[in-house]
Amino acid sequence: HYSSRRQRQMCIRDRKGGSSREKWMKNDKPVLPGRLNDLRHIIYKSADTQWRQAKNNMGLMLKEGLLKENIDGEALKWAFNKMNKRKEDRKILMVISDGAPVDDSTLSTNTSDYLETNLKKTVKWIESKSNIELLAIGIGHDVTRYYNRAVKITDVHDLGDAMINQL
């Protein structure tokens, strides 16, 4: 539900690459431009927030229309950089995925495996070069081709149990 026509137009524009794609088009559409979509990082629960305070936010992951483009590799790098600055001895980065990374603007202007390759390189680096534990849960999709420590669930209602079991 959008409260104004402008919000509706902005949402549609964002799903088509946003200002990144507009800039690319104004610059004569260079070949193989890399990521061609604006980024939006949504934090459902920060490390400092108690679970009971963030419980309602977790349900937003299931909101239809909120997430249309998934640039997983860059989102993972962003989360890693934030987490890497923290002081805790044990750090766990949990990915909840609906499958493969997808961004129509990027995939239509680069190689078809561009986003998957970026994700695989990012995961490999985090898993081999850092002390951050990387866990993944695929909802309806097997994500073990990307993550070493991953499980698949078929029903979103199993998410809570899967999260606890992964820890």
Regions found by a protein language model. Give the residues of each.
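Short, charged loop segments at secondary-structure junctions
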Residues: 17-74
